[in-house]
Amino acid sequence: DLTTLKESDIPYLRRKLGVVFQDFKLLSDRSVKENLLFVLKATGWTEKEEMDAKIEEVLDKVGMKGFANKMPHQLSGGEQQRVGIARALLNDPEIILADEPTGNLDPQTSVEVMEVLRKINANGKTILMATHDYALVLKYPSKTLKFEGGKMFEVVQRTI
């Protein structure tokens, strides 16, 4: 119940959420691993072996194993977005908020990123995604809510 949430509890609530941004939000002067370490350290992780294992785990989940030492400018847009998804998974969130995760990607790369999100969802994670790409909504049937004119509507879809 958010109406009774104390301000001091907000950081703990945030840790239950993973966020995927449209424009990746990677630190350009840090490697993939350093980007992920930054988040782990900021959320209280201290053991190097545990952090290394967690980074390897999330990079593997998004198909980026072997990219830990790459810099963001060495990655394609889709690869950067997969690192963003890995970052969102670091603290094992209950919900992943994805704000236009395919908005800056070409159609083929968008499908690849959606496949990563679909697999994460199939493994039990709730993903709340905002998108303007109706073709992706049709390709990946799920519970879909449409916001229009200040009102919310549920869109009923047929599964194929």
Q: What residue ranges belong to the model's regions?
A:
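Conserved ABC ATPase signature
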Residues: M71-L75, E79-Q81
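ABC ATPase NBD coupling module
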Residues: L2-G18, K48-E49, I120-A122
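Conserved ABC ATPase "signature" region
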Residues: D1, L37, K41-G44, K48-F67
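Catalytic Walker B motif of ABC-type/P-loop ATPase nucleotide-binding domains
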Residues: I96-D99
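Helix N-cap at the start of a conserved alpha-helix in ABC-type nucleotide-binding domains
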Residues: P107-T109
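Short coil-to-helix segment of the ABC ATPase nucleotide-binding domain corresponding to the Q-loop/switch region
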Residues: R30-F38
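Conserved catalytic motifs of ABC-family nucleotide-binding domains
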Residues: D92
